[in-house]
Amino acid sequence: VICQFFDILAEELNAKIVLASGNEGNLKMAVHKTFVADDTTLRSFIEGDEHSVEGDNKAYIRYGQMDFYGNDTKAFKIQAVICNTERNTIIKRFEVPMTEEANNGVWQYWCSSNFKQYDTDILDTSFDKYFSGYVGMSWTVDSVSMRRYATIDVYVIDNPETNANHKYRLGFEIVGEDGQRVDGYAATYTATFDNNGIAGWDDGTADGSVSDMATAMGTLCVGSYS
């Protein structure tokens, strides 16, 4: 993770690295939750923005990587999901199980037909119907803290014919244990977290959005937005 890189660099340079935070503004690029006995689920939608594609055409795109950190050595369940927002129903789930050690560091991608590049890519009919692009997942264990963290990598464009009203949205769902905490960070301008006003989904926040880069021993962090 990036905090380890900063520690190594600061030691080699015999210097302190100053991180200026604050450029996140009010973008909801972070999400945090401490689970309690009667609420062990964190779910949020991955949102993006309109971008130019193929000349003057515009498309609603979410892209980039999101990292989700546990606060201890325990595994947590994380899935990327497709939700029918009109019915508030998850219609598809994607997962690289964190409970199976053979999956440590393994990437798995699901994609639409026009984005399939590798033999290991899985062409998913539901994803292909409503989106163009891909969603990838992986997890590993931090070698210093021994905390587990997962990454979701997306490039997703809503299908202009079957999903023109953004009825079907991509999100994620995390299930943990009582007392466990998970912190997630998105790619700011290209991906944020939102509940879209739908019951049972968690909203993103700008709080804590400087990410784990500020936790390095050789850094000083100034100017946090919140």
Each PLM stretch: what is its role?
Residues V1-S226:
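Loop-rich non-cytosolic ectodomains and luminal regions
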